């Protein structure tokens, strides 16, 4: 399973359960099944996401469809046109579908007392994640022309709901809490989702591919509309915008273009950091108001925070905003 993620959603759920003071065997058994369903759904999303993006690697290993298709050649599509379909792509599509079925089976294992509420939320999460993936594809097709509202909505749907809101609410339901926590958690999760999506954008551009497992050239070459690009472009002088327009969306961008873009990100980091602090601050305030302790919030953020080793030193200076 670690090929498909760090299990951070399950770890977030565990911290929330601990913070709610619930840890009986029935609650933990229910949470285990709920988290299994969530992790299987996450694996399905990654397999399909790599297929959609035509990604060759994930975490420095071949993506599922690339690994499966290696050395198998191609097979003919079952139609009159004689098109060729890569066997790996077929396997990736079907494997993702199979993982979705397995995730539903895991949810079915939740005891009846908690199953209805969790299953209802799980369906909502799945639909939002799928819609968020579509929004992400549209943003990439539109290149850098999209506005910040569209970018934020994509981050909430694609990232926040199943990475933050789902594990927190699963724990709340398993602990016997009702829908009274849904509002605060959705608000906090939406802010966290935007914040960590922005951090992911920074990491992809500024990071060492050997550490991040991602190419820093992908977004640069595609001209993808990201929150990071929007913020940097908003802060650029006329001369800097000329540089930005030359390198962002350049299909054959290389190290020279990447260096220019990285320099612009570094120069305008204070504006990016201000947005991060606003988003994280709003999330923390909402969780505190719902009764979550500072320690629980700190633990949640530590699990959600993406790897920053090998990233520009500025990232280590992000103010965590905690007292003491």
Predicted regions and their residues:
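All-alpha prenyltransferase/terpene-synthase fold signal
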Residues: 1-324
């Amino acid at each position: 399973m670690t090929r498909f993620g760090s299990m951070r959603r399950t770890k977030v759920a565990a911290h929330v359960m601990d913070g709610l003071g619930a840890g009986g065997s029935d609650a933990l058994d229910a949470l285990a099944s709920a988290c299994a369903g969530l992790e299987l759904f996450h694996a399905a999303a990654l397999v399909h996401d790599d297929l959609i993006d035509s990604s060759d690697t994930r975490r420095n290993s071949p993506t599922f469809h690339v690994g499966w298709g290696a050395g198998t050649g191609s097979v003919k599509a079952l139609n009159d046109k004689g098109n060729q379909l890569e066997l790996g792509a077929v396997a990736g599509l079907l494997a993702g579908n199979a993982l979705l079925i397995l995730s539903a089976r895991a949810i079915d294992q939740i005891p009846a007392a908690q199953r209805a509420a969790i299953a209802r939320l799980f369906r909502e999460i799945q639909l939002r994640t799928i819609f968020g993936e579509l929004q992400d594809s549209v943003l990439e097709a539109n290149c850098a022309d999209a506005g910040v509202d569209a970018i934020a909505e994509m981050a909430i749907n694609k990232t926040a709901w199943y990475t933050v809101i789902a594990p927190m609410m699963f724990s709340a339901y398993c602990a016997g809490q009702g829908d009274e926590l849904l509002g605060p958690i959705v608000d906090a999760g939406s802010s966290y989702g935007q914040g960590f999506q922005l951090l992911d954008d920074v990491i992809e551009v500024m990071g060492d591919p050997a550490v991040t497992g991602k190419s820093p050239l992908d977004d640069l070459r595609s001209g993808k509309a990201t929150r990071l690009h929007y913020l940097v472009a908003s802060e650029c002088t006329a001369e800097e915008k000329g540089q930005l327009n030359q390198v962002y969306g350049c299909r054959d961008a290389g190290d020279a273009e990447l260096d220019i873009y990285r320099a612009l990100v570094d120069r305008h980091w204070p504006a990016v950091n201000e947005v991060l602090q606003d988003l994280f601050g709003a999330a923390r305030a909402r969780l505190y108001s719902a009764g979550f302790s500072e320690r629980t919030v700190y633990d949640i953020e530590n699990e959600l925070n993406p790897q920053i080793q090998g990233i520009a030193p500025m990232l280590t200076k992000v103010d965590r905003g905690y007292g003491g």
